[in-house]
Amino acid sequence: MRLEAIRSVYFVGAGGIGMSALIRYFLSKGKTVAGYDRTSSELTERLITEGAQIHYEEDIDLIPEECKDKASTLVVYTPAVPQGHAELTYFRENGFNIHKRSQVLGIITRSSKGLCVAGTHGKTTTSTMAAHLLHQSHVGCIAFLGGISKNYGTNLLLSATSPYTVIEADEFDRSFHWLSPWMSVITATDPDHLDIYGTKEAYLESFRHYTTLIQPGGALILHKGLEMQADVQPGVTTYTYSRNEGDFHAENIRIGNGEIFIDFVAPDTRINDIQLGVPVSINIENGVAAMALAHLSGATDEEIKQGMASFRGVDRRFDFKLKNDRIVFLSDYAHHPAEIAQSVKSVRELYQDKKITVIFQPHLYTRTRDFYRDFADSLSLSDEVILTEIYPAREQPIPGVTSQLIYDNLRPGIEKCICRKEDVLSLLTQKHTEVLVVLGAGDLDNYAPQITQLLSEKYHG
């Protein structure tokens, strides 16, 4: 596929976070961009104002004429879209050039030095942090991110001069196997997406294969203690990192008064008194990985220090919506048991003497079936759990798999209930809340503005 010959790009599933970064990229190249998504969202409406044509009905008559010339149109789809989708079927039957999102991302980034962040969790924050460190340094970067950077209000960063592209490397559907990393961080390999992989062993094998793709001369930055076996090519340097040990790590950690300061230790330098712009304990580890990437890419110690202090975070990643003396409300994308445990522990560290209420919307029937006991254990670290129905995304219901499975396995004595997401607001009006955490990768976050308004009126302070 020669991208130069493409005049229009059509996206089936335009509202996904990864798809939207590609939409913005092709708009920046002056292409005609159109697409379909199932529902309107703040993101799709933003894309329309930026120049994309997006509709919400599955109807081939709504495909713009410019996108019906198969010689000059590229069709991009996400695996979340059913194979029988009418528009996808139209393009397939008429011989259009059709590629998965991950394939297109691999093609676009092949000619640059890819700085990739892979792993079960932590990759969105780590990659966005690394992109910020480089973008505000003399090195610069292009970046395709899996979340909206609060510093830039977008998930795409551009540079006319930098050789580097920061990429969130997604293991879902083995998407990251299309990439050609120059350097890669691997944050975690807790099994996930077992609907795709089947077994833990197959999941770990997928990460092993991914490490073979790192280019000679580059580097692998591997979290200490992972089960996976790396298999890098000759000429690839392997480093380790973690919060407290490894080639890259933090020392002299100071947490207090809503602030975190650390010293960053690398094999050939030490940067003292770094302030975390988003002072959450998990960002110590994320920050070490991001700083390792930036350091190995040529950012100076002072640029790294300034960038860490000015980092503002990612939408829906430990995202404070409301914070005063009477009420704290934050939203977090955590949707895997290990992520939820980290999230709740980080909240507990900040608010040790307050009651922590978690509202969790489970994401996918298969993930709930595979991990319901682990979800219950992680959620039980809070004081109160409110469960909503499962968000299905791409899946059909599985008999017997509901939020009740998690509910029944929560620790004895914990306050708990199950409710429809539509009833969350009325439930919160009746409850006394001190720290509220909304967790999940589904659509419950769409209620965040209404929850924020309700809580600020109820606990104005």
Where are these regions (language model features)?
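Nucleotide phosphate-binding/pyrophosphate-handling subdomain across enzymes
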Residues: 2-8, 18, 25, 29, ...
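Phosphate-binding loop of NTP-binding sites
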Residues: 25-31, 62-68, 79-224, 228-237, ...
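C-terminal helical cap/extension that packs against the catalytic core
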Residues: 50, 376-434
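Beta-strand->loop->alpha-helix junctions that form or flank phosphate-binding loops
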Residues: 36-37, 55-60, 99-103, 144-146, ...
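Short acidic/histidine-rich motifs immediately flanking catalytic phosphotransfer sites
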Residues: 68-74, 162-163, 432-434
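Hydrophobic Val/Ile/Leu positions in short beta-strands of Rossmann-like dinucleotide-binding domains
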Residues: 11, 77, 117-119, 438
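Short internal beta-strands
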Residues: 31-38, 220-224, 357-360, 382-392
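N-terminal leader/targeting and accessory segments in enzymes
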Residues: 1-100, 104, 219, 249, ...
